[in-house]
């Protein structure tokens, strides 16, 4: 009986403390289709979350903040291009990174590219992305 009660309490604890995750599209084509269907903007995240120090800080301070997660999931379709420390120039992730970097003229990591559902550029944000308040303020201002 004690064992059953223990597992019930453990199960309840796990599910009440679990935080929602940012919903990410697996590829850009899917992100575009979802944005049109859901009438949301597209947020392209250019990052190197394993090795880029500002990217690591952005992930910790912004993308792991529950307020940001909730806001982002409600307002954006997110497509992340996360460059690994050792990338191959022929890889899909590197090709995506190169394409978006050139198209939206940003060399900064991290960068956020905000598009409307028709892919019209709203903004490229590459400053103060490690600061939760500044990032939220900018995204809400552009919404």
Regions found by a protein language model. Name each.
Residues 52-55, 112:
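The canonical Cys-X-X-Cys-His
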Residues 24-42, 72:
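A short beta-strand-turn-helix
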Residues 38-52:
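Short active-site neighborhood of thiol/selenol oxidoreductases, capturing the structured segment around
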Residues 23-25, 68-94:
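Thiol-based oxidoreductase modules, predominantly thioredoxin-like and allied folds used
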């Amino acid at each position: 009986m004690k064992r059953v009660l223990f597992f019930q309490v453990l199960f309840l604890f796990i599910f009440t403390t679990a935080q929602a995750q940012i919903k990410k599209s697996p590829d850009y084509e899917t992100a575009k289709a979802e944005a049109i269907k859901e009438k949301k903007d597209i947020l392209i995240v250019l990052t190197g979350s394993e090795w880029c120090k500002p990217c690591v800080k952005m992930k910790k301070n912004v993308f792991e903040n529950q307020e940001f997660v909730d806001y982002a999931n409600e307002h954006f379709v997110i497509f992340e291009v996360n460059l690994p420390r050792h990338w191959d120039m022929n890889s899909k992730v590197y090709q995506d990174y190169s394409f978006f970097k050139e198209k939206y003229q940003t060399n900064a990591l991290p960068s956020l590219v905000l598009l409307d559902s028709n892919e019209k550029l709203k903004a490229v944000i590459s400053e103060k992305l490690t600061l939760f308040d500044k990032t939220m303020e900018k995204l809400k201002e552009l919404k």
